[in-house]
């Protein structure tokens, strides 16, 4: 991995690395925050998945997470949201193509050549992190919007791999809302069974489980009713007896002003779970 940025932050280092991804067949950037204790010991890892139009920079520059990661001794890994490059398929819209990988494995041309974000996040990236950084095998996952969707899907489909999961403003029923339907139709065609493999509410209804789900949702979020539908997740978790910590916040929107307001509580939540395991 090639170090391309290095910034001192709260006694540790906020770095950005570039590497070639075998899964995605392109160069990828990934942000890695190494807290002070990482200089002398191995630490657990929190993976953060960002939302539509984002790259590895949004979370590491806007959330203020470094303060809390340093306090709780957690390495934070923030990858890009899709494969990148002039040779990678793209679309003239913000919710498909580069910047909108949806953390799935595309099956349809032209997307299936590079869009294997599910494999990248689940397999390739953790292997790289374990090899290059002072990381233990314990990991948790979180994300925002499309990234919250990805975090929930990865945790629900791999409950033994992630100690805990949380999300900000996640797309919880993508097969039922425009963002998800448009992306799934392009990446997965009209195979509705494949769609449900990347739909948190559907996965839970089919019996997939995690110990607990933490979600924060702003009630002034312009996408809340049409695209996110957080109450669908709350309802299915109640029906399936999955413990939740779902909080609704008056006045907060979909932006990083919202994420930065509560990221400290999410990192503390994951730190507690990681230290218990």
Curated annotation (Swiss-Prot):
Top-level taxon: Bacteria
Gene: frmB
CC annotations in GO: cytosol
Sequence similarity: Belongs to the esterase D family.
The entry's keywords: Hydrolase, Serine esterase
Catalytic activity: S-formylglutathione + H2O = formate + glutathione + H(+)
Keyword Hydrolase assigned: yes
BP GO terms, sorted: formaldehyde catabolic process
SUPFAM superfamilies for the chain: alpha/beta-Hydrolases (SSF53474)
Enzyme's top EC category: hydrolase
Catalytic activity, EC: 3.1.2.12
InterPro entries (UniProt xref): AB_hydrolase_fold, Esterase-like, S-formylglutathione_hydrol
Name listed for the protein in its UniProt record: S-formylglutathione hydrolase FrmB
Organism: Escherichia coli (strain ATCC 8739 / DSM 1576 / NBRC 3972 / NCIMB 8545 / WDCM 00012 / Crooks)
Molecular-function GO term, any one: S-formylglutathione hydrolase activity
Function, in words: Serine hydrolase involved in the detoxification of formaldehyde. Hydrolyzes S-formylglutathione to glutathione and formate.
A UniProt-annotated Pfam family: Esterase
Active site: 145, 221, 254
């Amino acid at each position: 991995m090639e170090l391309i940025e290095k910034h001192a932050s709260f006694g540790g280092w906020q770095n950005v690395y570039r590497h070639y991804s075998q899964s995605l067949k392109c160069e990828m950037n990934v942000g890695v925050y190494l807290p002070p204790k990482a200089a002398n010991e191995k630490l657990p890892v929190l993976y953060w998945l960002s939302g539509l139009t984002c790259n590895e920079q949004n979370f590491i520059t806007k959330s203020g997470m470094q303060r809390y990661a340093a306090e709780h001794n957690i390495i934070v890994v923030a990858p890009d949201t899709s494969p990148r490059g002039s040779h990678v398929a793209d679309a003239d819209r913000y919710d498909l193509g580069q910047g909108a990988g949806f953390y799935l494995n595309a099956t349809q041309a032209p997307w299936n050549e590079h869009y294997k974000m599910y494999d990248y996040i689940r397999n390739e990236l953790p292997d790289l992190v374990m090899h290059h950084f002072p990381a233990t095998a314990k990991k948790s996952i979180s994300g925002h919007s499309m990234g919250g969707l990805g975090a929930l899907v990865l945790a629900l489909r791999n409950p033994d791999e992630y100690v805990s999961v949380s999300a900000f403003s996640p797309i919880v029923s993508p097969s039922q809302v425009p963002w998800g339907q448009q992306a799934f139709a392009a990446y997965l065609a009209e195979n509705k069974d494949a769609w449900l493999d990347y739909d948190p509410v559907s996965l839970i209804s089919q019996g997939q489980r995690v110990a607990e789900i933490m979600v924060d949702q702003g009630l002034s979020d312009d996408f809340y009713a049409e695209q996110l539908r957080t109450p669908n997740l709350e309802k299915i978790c109640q029906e399936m007896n999955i413990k939740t910590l779902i909080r609704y916040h008056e006045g907060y929107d979909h932006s990083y002003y919202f994420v930065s307001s509560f990221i400290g509580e999410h990192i503390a939540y994951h730190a507690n779970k990681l230290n218990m395991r």
